[in-house]
């Protein structure tokens, strides 16, 4: 089954005139077979086994299970070694989960531009450098100057979304940089984009990387805004939707 969509045709926010969600084009259904390494997977598409690019270098072990229904975007570049990108998984008992690690930043950019985070009109700059740091988004207006770091969340168990799915020293570094921004007089936000619907809350993945959870607690105490939002996920699109409770208490020993 093939879905043909156009990236340019995005729904507009009536108030702000900005795109509210990210769309893919030329979506194809397949069945996951195996993942030889972090970058590629073997997927059965229309009866043929294809080597496809995995748009997420995380472990994703709970998602990429043999026989699982997946959705892929066909590349428009004929020179590529792989013709498809694996972007979405239909997890048993959960439904569709977008696993594209690039889309949270893009979706967050459009979502903030559309006026969903701040009440006033803001100017949003992606990939903004400040000192020795580079943040996903920089927001400025007459009322505020803020840095936003975006993290995509694909790990879920028992209706709880968790991050990270593997130890992330880079993630710890980003949190410490947000704390530094607060100390310099800026607003600072960690925006957790949960790439699925229906979770009850977000928690740090204490068992996988305790230091990240502890640094997240430190960031909250320093005044960093920790926000989590779920997403409506369809084979051809992902839309940031509703706030999700954030629980930073540690019950893991």
Predicted regions, residues:
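A short acidic/basic microdomain associated with nuclease active sites
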Residues: 116-130
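Nucleic-acid nuclease catalytic cores
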Residues: 159-169, 179-208, 230
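OB-fold/S1-family single-stranded nucleic acid-binding modules
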Residues: 80-93
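Domain-level recognition of nuclease-like catalytic cores that cleave nucleotide substrates
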Residues: 3-6, 11-12, 196-253
């Amino acid at each position: 089954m093939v879905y043909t969509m156009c990236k340019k045709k995005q729904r507009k926010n009536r108030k702000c005139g900005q795109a509210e969600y990210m769309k893919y084009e030329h979506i194809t259904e397949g069945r996951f077979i195996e993942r030889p390494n972090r970058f590629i997977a073997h997927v059965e598409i229309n009866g043929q086994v294809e080597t496809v690019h995995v748009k997420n270098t995380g472990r994703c072990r709970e998602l990429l299970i043999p026989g699982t229904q997946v959705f892929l975007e066909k590349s428009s570049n004929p020179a590529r070694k792989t013709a498809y990108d694996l972007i979405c998984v239909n997890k048993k008992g959960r439904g569709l989960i977008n696993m594209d690690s690039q889309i949270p930043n893009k979706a967050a950019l459009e979502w903030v531009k559309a006026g969903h985070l701040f009440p006033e009109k803001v100017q949003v700059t992606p990939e903004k450098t400040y000192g020795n740091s580079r943040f996903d988004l920089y927001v400025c207006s007459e009322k505020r100057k803020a840095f936003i770091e975006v993290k995509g969340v694909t790990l879920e168990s028992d209706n709880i979304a968790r991050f990270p799915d593997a130890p992330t020293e880079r993630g710890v570094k980003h949190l410490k940089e947000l704390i530094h921004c607060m100390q310099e007089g800026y607003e600072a936000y960690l925006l957790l984009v949960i790439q699925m619907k229906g979770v009850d809350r977000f928690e740090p993945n204490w068992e996988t990387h305790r230091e990240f959870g502890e640094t997240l607690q430190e960031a909250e105490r320093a005044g960093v805004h920790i926000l989590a939002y779920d997403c409506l996920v369809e084979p051809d699109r992902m839309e940031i939707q509703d706030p999700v409770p954030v629980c930073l208490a540690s019950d893991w020993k």
